[in-house]
């Protein structure tokens, strides 16, 4: 399980160093193989250990290529999916087209989200967090049943 937000740097070749606390698990559970794709709702990237991505691919394969919405989701997620192999130094190369989608330059937020990571431009990440907090503070609507059961 991945959790927490960590600032990492992209080097001049577009590589990021995976934080040490995640490396061993990624090697043991995914042989250091990950898949990176775009988030179709936010200006960030999604980074999955290969076994987790294979579950997503199975779900995508069951969507209908005849349904325009389902086909669009397949095209966006699979068409941007790029395999990333963690090197001996624990670095991952993020493809240029993916970096461009998320506006990644030098400083990147690696955000744990249970079975995957999100990769955000640092400035965009903090703007998003502020927007989300503001939205929660001003929310007047009903909570979903699942959120009502969540006690923090």
Curated annotation (Swiss-Prot):
Any single GO molecular-function term of the entry would be: DNA-binding transcription factor activity
Q: Where in the cell is it found?
A: Cytoplasm, Nucleoid
For this UniProt entry, what's an example GO CC term? nucleoid
Where in this chain does the record put each SpoVT-AbrB domain?
5-52, 81-124
Please tell me whether the keyword DNA-binding is annotated for this protein: yes
- PROSITE patterns, per this entry? SPOVT_ABRB
One Pfam family in the UniProt entry: MraZ
| Entry keywords, A to Z | Cytoplasm, DNA-binding, Repeat, Repressor, Transcription, Transcription regulation
Which InterPro entries is this protein grouped with?
MraZ, MraZ_C, MraZ_dom, MraZ_N, MraZ_sf, SpoVT-AbrB_dom, SpoVT-AbrB_sf
Per the record, the GO terms for biological process are: negative regulation of DNA-templated transcription initiation
Q: What is its main location?
A: cytoplasm
Lineage, top-rank taxon, reads Bacteria
List the coiled-coil residues: none
What is the stated purpose of this protein?
Negatively regulates its own expression and that of the subsequent genes in the proximal part of the division and cell wall (dcw) gene cluster. Acts by binding directly to DNA. May also regulate the expression of genes outside the dcw cluster.
Subunit comment: Forms oligomers.
The family this protein is said to belong to: Belongs to the MraZ family.
Q: What is this protein called?
A: Transcriptional regulator MraZ
Q: Which gene encodes it?
A: mraZ
